[in-house]
From Swiss-Prot:
Region (Interaction with TP53): 885-1094
Organism: Rattus norvegicus
Domain Protein kinase: 190-518
PANTHER family for this protein: DUAL SPECIFICITY PROTEIN KINASE (PTHR24058), HOMEODOMAIN-INTERACTING PROTEIN KINASE 1 (PTHR24058:SF43)
Gene: Hipk1
Catalytic activity: L-seryl-[protein] + ATP = O-phospho-L-seryl-[protein] + ADP + H(+); L-threonyl-[protein] + ATP = O-phospho-L-threonyl-[protein] + ADP + H(+)
Listed name of the protein: Homeodomain-interacting protein kinase 1
PROSITE patterns assigned: PROTEIN_KINASE_ATP, PROTEIN_KINASE_DOM, PROTEIN_KINASE_ST
GO terms, biological process: adherens junction assembly; anterior/posterior pattern specification; cell population proliferation; embryonic camera-type eye morphogenesis; embryonic retina morphogenesis in camera-type eye; endothelial cell apoptotic process; extrinsic apoptotic signaling pathway; intrinsic apoptotic signaling pathway in response to DNA damage by p53 class mediator
Location of the protein in the cell: Nucleus; Cytoplasm; Nucleus speckle
SMART domains the record matches: S_TKc
Length: 1211
């Protein structure tokens, strides 16, 4: 009588948990062989529950079938094929013995027509072989099945591949599960629900934890002696991992370990589906890169953690990467199965590790290995996801190394010579004068070993670069297609680094996380692409997450061993999981008594920004209790924070929901999308009065970066006095900065104002001189009487989310104030108050070719929300330095901080040594749309950026500026090569008067950015500021050059204009800077950083926005002169090395040091030698509010010292 196969039935095809096995399902329609695990055998189960089968008393008997019951014609005998069978599991540590046998394979006839040749679901994943026949699947590789004796087939399958209802150990050491059986530990009991899968060292069952009624997965290890040692290693590794945050580092959470009937049982969280089953469910179709990226990021994060612990997973493959919850958390994955894991110090060269398709060359060749083998496996996994088929599906190790060598070239000679197993696959060529290794031909290998080589590849590539051409999506076009091609280039670049044959040169998990494919900085060139937006949305799943039962206190259960009486064989060991701090912001931010947190009153959270940080999340980036000592409190209001947690420990931005453009104030709340260059949570702020309370210790030692808080006033008849609170930053190394508070600091801001809280992430840049650089904040009000609305300009740019890469540097997060999150913050306060027209019009104008505005001033939009600098060791995204020529009417000016020290420099200095007589002023001219325009100038100093050339968006080429003499600075026909190497970017004005269409057209708006060839400057000095149709950039001739660029305009003089004669010599003449007699604040920047940005932003005319930069939005209050305030305020943050001779020449420094960048301040604001006291209404009636440490050379109070103008005879 034929033996009956009794198997358990899972509820669905995709149900699996902590298992590395593929399922062989036996269904009436045919056999669906979905592969197998790293073990040498399969298991079978069925979805059908025949009602005619008998029921066992204590177990549920299912899927009973007789092989003889099948028609003999339904059994197809495959031709005899030679196979290699490794009797011992590869990763068991025991020696593998190879035997050769003729294996008869068995398949169901109806399955032949269902499987495509390339979709062989019965892929062997470790030591087994793949039959080359397209539809015949190998079921067993044990002694040949005797087809003439069906009972033998059933018996063999019963003992090796199927679980029965008997609850006893098999000869292989597997525990025989019984459904509804109770597995008991010392503290919990688990009921077996169903069989999930079989792995190398045991099997996995889905169980029900009775005490908590939760579903868990229990891995029951074999009790065979050969697996005992590896089982102990797995238990010890899981015990070590249990002290880490499993959700943060993306590996399976383990609960406890216990003994049941002499079998070690490991309890894990229940996961849904592995990647192989997911691919199979989708018919092995290629996975788009936007889905591969989050999987890669999460697995690389897990490998990064394992590497830091000195652990090797050694069996990374799609089967061991589990989808946590495909429905609610798409592409949220975790790494499972540490049964093959080992410590790097205990790695043995001769050990068989890894499934063959994902086996690193050093394992195949018998070389010493380390954690780098996991990176090779991960590269093979992401290649398989991309192709839908394994990249190197070798049927044997020879085929595996042959595939690798054909695509990537032979391993280096020194690797082949050092390998202990090299001679199995390579020969030395005796015909050459010196011995070189040569791969054996398939015939030679077959002759030596008797193993026939097979071809199982779906794609055969001559090199990995060819992968970019396959499976190109046909539904993408335009910018989406350009973004996809750019994404593929970065993907291939990373893949080649992961699949480097030499393990010493292979990319590490940390570098993988910082690669552009993961950080997506290359996609910033396509901000308007829906495809790119979906890429960023998919990476949301990579945010740090905290489990619901994590508590504030780290409660660690000890790893205990419960010694039971001799009558019991149970051994219980409890895995302790790190219960990290709950990021429940309401509770965390309320705990300001110990570590003062920032309590922000937020409401109407209709401004969304992607909370994705595209770098690794090291544990050292966690909040440091000694750092978060003080905070900023915005009151009154409830302690209501965003509903989401703050996984990246970032600062919040309090952003105004709307900026009124009418003549009277309004309370309408309308969320305004903000494009920031830093991924931080954005929430709108209600326009209610918000007092700012700044605690005295808000600045800590080494903190040099201010956080600017600006208040924007709507149109109201009267405005209460505003208070600017600049803090002295005496940033000498080792000296804490001091803040002197006055009554002005603690007075409430007036009602109806809107606050912008700008966090700073600039100190995260590595290599930045933090202790000697200050980014000051200046408020420069100019007279303005226009009623022109700014909504038109704002609408010129489409509003979308901009994302950036913020690489949190742990070394830079130690001495900075945090808002309960370890985000480095310093606070400086500045208010923007509009001032009525008070200055007289200029006495003369330049000749214009078209009607222009009566006055021209260099201005910056008030309340510009400046993008933060996102940085990683590989890329620094620049931000904006905003200067604006505004025509006809004047508006208050803010020159906020340049957010990034290593970014562009706007330098204003007087070259006292080689000053020439002709001084240049900013031109007051028009382009073609309107007067009363507001433009932005961004100066970047990286000459090697090709962002503008690769941009899919056109940039307008402007005609040259006209100077005082009416001559052109440069003709419109001049090529970009004639320009200078650096680049200045100006956002175009949308309304300018239509000027001459000839070459004499004047430009006050956009000067499109373009990569221009650097031109050597005269005598190694500064080549000045050259304005060309294609580039307007500050060129530094030498490492110590500092550029003159005037940022202000004397209202008493004529409208400033710039002119420069260009000769045939491409080297520009030396340009002089007109420096107004104004007080100036030194800006400190860094130029010589090796981490200087290589990809710089560039602006394009509206509506086509720059691909690599965030949108600049104008959050401006109405511009009617009747509703403007009459006073303004100024907040200066000075660096100690700032010279008091602000208008004088500044000492140049080596390129490795910071450069002084003095920024001029409008004459209507500060007292200076040339400005009458009546022109400046001092806003702070009484006491000085700037405190200074001893030894500082900066000003310590109002009024500021007058500018030394003795050097400027022309003023």
């Amino acid at each position: 009588m034929a033996s009956q196969l009794q198997v358990f039935s899972p509820p669905s095809v995709s149900s699996s948990a902590f298992c590395s096995a593929k399922k062989l399902k036996i269904e009436p329609s045919g056999w669906d062989v979905s592969g197998q695990s790293s073990n040498d055998k399969y298991y079978t189960h069925s979805k059908t529950l025949p009602a005619t089968q008998g029921q066992a008393s204590s177990s549920h008997q299912v899927a009973n079938f007789n092989i003889p019951a099948y028609d003999q014609g339904l059994l197809l005998q495959a031709p005899a094929v030679e196979h290699i069978v490794v009797t011992a599991a590869d990763s068991s540590g025991s020696a593998a013995t190879a035997t050769f046998q003729s294996s008869q394979t068995l398949t169901h006839r109806s399955n032949v027509s269902l499987l495509e040749p390339y979709q062989k679901c019965g892929l062997k994943r470790k030591s087994e072989e793949v039959d080359s026949n397209g539809s015949v699947q190998i079921i067993e590789e044990h002694p040949p099945l005797m087809l003439q004796n069906r009972t033998v087939v059933g018996a063999a399958a019963t003992t090796t591949t199927v679980t029965t209802k008997s609850s006893s150990s098999s000869g292989e050491g597997d525990y025989q599960l019984v459904q509804h059986e109770i597995l008991c530990s010392m503290t919990n009991s688990y009921e077996v629900l169903e069989f999930l899968g079989r792995g190398t060292f045991g099997q996995v069952a889905k169980c029900w934890k009775r005490s908590t009624k939760e579903i868990v997965a229990i891995k029951i290890l074999k009790n065979h002696p050969s697996y005992a040692r590896q089982g102990q290693i797995e238990v010890s590794i899981l015990s070590r991992l249990s002290s880490e945050n499993a959700d943060e580092y993306n590996f399976v959470r383990s609960y406890e370990c216990f003994q049941h009937k002499n079998h070690t049982c490991l309890v894990f969280e229940m996961l849904e589906q592995n990647l192989y089953d997911f691919l199979k469910q989708n018919k092995f179709s290629p996975l788009p890169l936007k889905y591969i990226r989050p999987i890669l990021q999460q697995v690389a994060t897990a490998l990064m953690k394992l590497k830091s612990l000195g652990l090797i997973h050694a069996d990374l493959k799609p089967e061991n990467i589990m989808l946590v919850d495909p429905v609610r958390q798409p592409y949220r994955v975790k790494v499972i199965d540490f049964g093959s894991a080992s410590h790097v110090s205990k790695a043995v060269c001769s050990t068989y590790l890894q499934s063959r398709y994902y086996r690193a060359p050093e394992i195949i060749l018998g070389l010493p290995f380390c954690e780098a083998i996991d990176m090779w496996s991960l590269g093979c996994v992401i290649a398989e996801l991309f192709l839908g088929w394994p990249l190197y599906p070798g049927a044997s190790e020879y085929d595996q190394i042959r595939y690798i060598s054909q695509t990537q070239g032979l391993p280096a000679e020194y690797l082949l010579s050092a390998g202990t197993k090299t001679t199995r696959f390579f020969n030395r060529d005796p015909n050459l004068g010196y011995p070189l290794w040569r791969l054996k031909t398939p015939e030679e290998h077959e002759l030596e070993t008797g193993i026939k080589s097979k071809e199982a590849r779906k794609y055969i590539f001559n090199c990995l670069d060819d992968m970019a051409q396959v499976n190109m999506s046909t539904d993408l076009e335009g910018t989406d297609m350009l973004a996809e091609k750019a994404d593929r280039r970065e993907y291939i670049d990373l893949l080649k680094k992961m699949l480097t044959i030499d393990a010493d040169k292979r990319v590490t998990p940390l570098k993988t996380l910082n690669h552009q494919f993961v950080t997506m900085t290359h996609l910033l060139d396509f901000p308007h692409s829906n495809h790119v937006k979906s890429c960023f949305q998919n990476m949301e799943i990579c945010k740090r997450r905290v489990h619901m039962y994590d508590t504030v206190s780290q409660i660690k259960s000890p790893f205990t061993t419960h010694v039971a009486p001799s009558t019991s064989t149970n051994l219980t060991m409890s895995f302790s999981n790190q219960l990290s701090t709950v990021h429940n912001q309401a509770s965390v931010l309320a705990s300001s008594s110990t570590a003062a947190a920032a309590t922000l009153s937020l409401a109407n959270s209709d401004v969304s920004l992607l909370n994705y940080q595209s770098a690794l999340y090291p544990p050292s980036a966690a909040p440091v209790p000694g750092v978060a000592q003080q905070g900023v409190s915005l009151q009154p209001g409830t302690t209501q924070i965003c509903t989401q947690t703050d996984p990246f420990q970032q600062t919040f931005i309090v952003c105004p929901p709307a900026f009124q453009t009418g003549l009277q104030a309004t309370t309408k709340h309308s969320g305004f999308p903000v494009r920031m260059d830093n991924a931080v949570p954005l929430v709108p702020q209600a326009p209610a009065a918000q007092p700012l309370q700044i605690q005295s210790g808000v600045l800590t030692q080494g903190s040099c970066t201010p956080l600017m808080v600006a208040t924007l006033h709507p149109q109201v008849a009267t405005i209460t006095p505003q208070y600017a609170v600049p803090f002295t930053l005496s940033c000498a190394a080792g000296r804490p900065a001091l803040v002197e508070q006055t009554a002005a600091v603690q007075q409430a801001w007036p009602g109806g104002t809107q606050q912008i809280l700008l966090p700073s992430a600039w100190q995260q840049l590595p290599g930045v001189a933090l202790h000697n650089s200050v980014q000051p904040t200046a408020v420069i009000p100019e007279a303005m009487g226009s009623s022109q609305q700014l909504a038109d300009w704002r609408n010129a740019h489409s509003h979308g989310n901009q994302y950036s890469t913020i690489m949190q540097q742990p070394s830079l997060l130690t001495n900075h104030v945090t808002l309960a999150t370890a985000q480095p913050l310093n606070v400086g306060v500045a208010h923007v108050v509009r001032q009525q027209q008070s200055s007289s019009l200029p006495s003369r104008k330049n000749k214009q070719s078209a009607p222009v505005s009566s006055t021209s001033s260099l201005e910056v939009l008030p309340s510009q929300v400046y993008s933060l600098v996102g940085s990683s060791p590989l890329r620094t995204t620049s931000s904006y330095n905003s200067l604006v020529p505004v025509q006809d009417q004047h508006q208050p000016i803010i020159i906020p901080d340049t957010p990034s020290p290593p970014v562009s420099v706007i330098t204003i200095r007087s070259d006292t040594d080689e000053e020439e007589d002709n001084k240049f002023k900013p031109s007051s001219s028009s382009l073609k749309a309107r007067s009363n325009v507001i433009s932005y100038v961004t100066v970047n100093d990286s000459p090697d950026s090709d962002s503008s050339l690769s941009s899919p968006y056109p940039t307008d080429t402007l005609s040259a500026l006209r100077g005082n003499s009416g001559t052109l600075l440069e003709g419109p026909g001049r090529t970009a090569a004639d320009g200078i190497g650096t680049r200045t970017i100006i956002v175009p004005p949308l309304k300018t008067q239509l000027g001459d269409c000839t070459g004499a057209t004047q430009a006050s708006g956009l000067l499109s950015s373009s990569k221009t060839k650097p031109v050597a400057s005269v005598s190694g000095q500064s080549s000045g500021c050259c304005i060309t149709p294609t580039g307007y950039r500050a060129q530094r001739g030498g490492a110590s050059a500092v550029q003159p660029l005037n940022l202000s305009q004397n209202q008493q003089s004529s409208s400033a204009s710039t002119s420069q004669e260009r000769s045939s010599n491409p080297a520009p003449r030396r340009q002089q800077a007109f420096v107004a007699p104004l007080s100036q604040a030194p800006y400190a920047f860094q130029h010589g950083s090796p981490l200087h940005s290589t990809g710089h932003p560039h602006l394009a005319p509206a509506p086509a926005h720059l691909p690599s930069q965030p949108h600049l939005y104008t959050y401006a209050a109405p511009t009617s002169a009747a509703a403007l305030g009459s006073t303004s305020s100024i907040a200066h943050l000075f660096s100690p090395q700032g010279s008091s001779r602000h208008a004088a020449a500044y000492t140049t420094h080596p390129s490795t040091l910071v450069h002084q960048v003095p920024v001029s301040v409008g004459p209507s604001l500060l007292t200076s030698a040339s400005v009458a006291p009546a022109q400046y209404q001092h806003q702070f009636a009484t006491q000085s509010y700037i405190g200074s440490s001893r030894g500082s050379t900066i000003y310590t109070g109002y009024p500021l010292s007058p500018t030394k103008i003795s050097q400027y005879s022309y003023l």
